[in-house]
Amino acid sequence: MRIPSRGRGEEGKEQWTLVPENVDDLWHLSHVLEPGDRVGGDTTRRIQRNDENLRDTGGQREHLVVTIEVADVEFARFANRLRVGGEIISCSREDELGHYHTLNVESHDEIIVTKKFAPDQRKRIEAAEEAAENADVAVATIEEGEAHIHTVAQYGTEEQFSRTATTGKGEYSQPRTELFAEFAAALSRMDVDAIILAGPGFTKQDAEEYIQSNNPEIIDKLTIVDTAAVGDRGVHEVLKRGAVDEVQTQTRISAEAELIDELMEGIATGEKIAYGIDEVAKAAEFGAVDDLLVVDDQLREERRDSGDWSTDVDTVLQNVEQQGGSVTVLSGEFDPGQRLRNLGGIAALLRYRLQ
């Protein structure tokens, strides 16, 4: 996510210019935008001309700049777009004011959002921005006598390591283990969440075995992918196959799963946990919450007043953050979030047990 500008809007609201850069960013926006927010951007709309001096286009689409008051939001995953519908309150054609319109927001579209951001919503957008700037995945490509390491961020790839050496027999050759040692040492120094180890043939498997024996601290980060080439071409193959996106998703799910496992263990042993809105709200009032966990779609429903919780969820979140606790919003699309939903959609890891 890019945030080109931030400013103040009317009635104490904030006005942010946002540019989603991938499907994940569109998904984040679907959990931030709410009814009553204002969203502006470029669009097309079918216009029926009624002016007798102008030729009727039969409803030809025209380019417009509009701002709508949000009524509904739909994340169309398979279309890779976010549909934001509502009444047009500002438009480059005044005769379109008051009509209902749907903005189809896709990757790299710029939109202007005016709303009162809740702390977790602001955190979500800023985390998406940070993800675009920081590399969290390395693509390591290797074949006989050649090895490369690239970091992958949403703005592109950057080569961090490159070695070419003659391995095998001969006066100027070096043992394969020397190349593997340099390669593994470089990977160990990298601050990334996951490493995709790719390349043709079996050299990558041999490198994996070397890492298992000599650099075991990074072995759990490795995912093996077959490619026909190494270097820039190999990285392109990895990206084209969607392997990086898949690894990033699995990394996020893994982090969420660790929290849920800790929660379930606490339930089993009677440790310091709370679950269900009533228990969590009580713990938040006492300042006992260390980490609050909530399912994203449940949070969205409660904010739209279409949920069934009797307590205002934003009050609970504010109490937690004011007392120095953290808030983790889990995706309801994956197993950790689904397990949390079965516990009422909200739970907390506590600093101390409530009597």
Swiss-Prot record:
Presence of the UniProt keyword Cytoplasm in the record: yes
Superkingdom of the organism of origin: Archaea
Subcellular location, record wording: Cytoplasm
UniProt main location, coarse: cytoplasm
MF annotations from Gene Ontology: endonuclease activity; metal ion binding
Cofactor(s) the protein requires to work: a divalent metal cation
SMART domains reported for this sequence: eRF1_1
Enzyme Commission numbers on file: 3.1.-.-
Entry keyword Cytoplasm: yes
InterPro entries per the UniProt record, alphabetical: eFR1_2_sf, eRF1_1_Pelota, eRF1_2, eRF1_3, Pelota/DOM34_N, Pelota_arc, Ribosomal_eL30-like_sf, Transl-rel_pelota
Swiss-Prot/TrEMBL domain comment: The N-terminal domain has the RNA-binding Sm fold. It harbors the endoribonuclease activity.
Protein family per UniProt: Belongs to the eukaryotic release factor 1 family. Pelota subfamily.
Subunit structure: Monomer.
Known role: May function in recognizing stalled ribosomes, interact with stem-loop structures in stalled mRNA molecules, and effect endonucleolytic cleavage of the mRNA. May play a role in the release non-functional ribosomes and degradation of damaged mRNAs. Has endoribonuclease activity.
Protein name: Protein pelota homolog
Organism: Haloquadratum walsbyi (strain DSM 16790 / HBSQ001)
Phylogenetic lineage: Archaea, Methanobacteriati, Methanobacteriota, Stenosarchaea group, Halobacteria
The gene coding this protein: pelA
